[in-house]
Amino acid sequence: MKLLIIIASILVLVFLLGWIGLQIRPRPFSPYPEQTGEIKTIPLAAGLPAPVERFYKTVYGEEIPVIDSAVMKGHAFIAPFGVKLPARFLFVHEAGKGYRHYFEATWFGMTIMKVNERYVDGKSLFEPPVGDPIIDDASTNQAANLAVWAEAAWFPSIWITDPRVRWEPVDDNTALLFVPFEDKMENFVMRFNPETGLLDSMEAMRYRDAGPQAKKILWITRNVEGKKIEGSKLNAIGSATWMDQGLPWATFTLEEVHYNVNVSEYIRQKGP
């Protein structure tokens, strides 16, 4: 009996230690050395669907910034294996064209998992923590292209400054956003908050897995009310959910952002 109590106590302590380690946020990445570049503006275009026009007037007013690139850093919780892990992230975007991601998941602030991925020149690269890299896979390319446009929720002017993009009305609080992918267009269902006018969520059919047998799953990204991007009305917190899982697999909190910086080389690198 005494031995069982000792074993149970050890198991409880191990579990508690593991849980405590997952509550500690990692230190942020070093600040990006280049400051936001010159940002030009264009007038808000006429003829947008009503909720879209309301959104842009709420966020920007009548003058819309032209964003060509973005470097974004922050903290996250990710659950790639069903266990919520604290993490830090780096997103580098060439607006409307490509990106790279770097994640570090941590335990007691120590890195236990690294992930590099990018989508540049229409080709994806995903380096999982375990296994071989996935390179220029058709399903992964489609998923990555949707991420290009979904992550633009942190610089949404690209959805009207890029001439390839178009909007279609649905109702007072919903519109369809059509974005280019290879030789065709794909679309998001964009849902806006009727009270604030801000974007609540984006929905699209997206591949989660690689390979020819992969199937599209409803993918939902949500803006989370609370912290705002400094100097703006845009939410700094966002989540991503696969419909068949029901709960977010990732929640990101943006803490540093620089727009219109030179990312021509940085977007092709790996690591922080």
Language model: regions and residue ranges:
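Short, solvent-exposed aromatic-acidic interface loops
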Residues: 105-111, 127-134, 204-209, 239-246
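Flexible, processing/modification-adjacent segments and terminal tails
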Residues: 126-182, 213, 270
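Short, hydrophobic/aromatic-rich segments at coil-to-beta transitions
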Residues: 66-73, 95-102, 170-178, 200-201, ...
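Gly/Pro-enriched, hydrophobic low-complexity segments
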Residues: 176-264
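Hydrophobic membrane-insertion alpha-helices, especially the h-region
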Residues: 5-23
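Short, exposed beta-strand/loop patches in secreted or surface proteins that constitute
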Residues: 89-95, 117, 163-170, 190-191, ...
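N-terminal mature ectodomain segment of secretory-pathway/periplasmic proteins
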Residues: 54-132
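N-terminal leader/targeting segments and the immediate start of mature chains
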Residues: 25-71
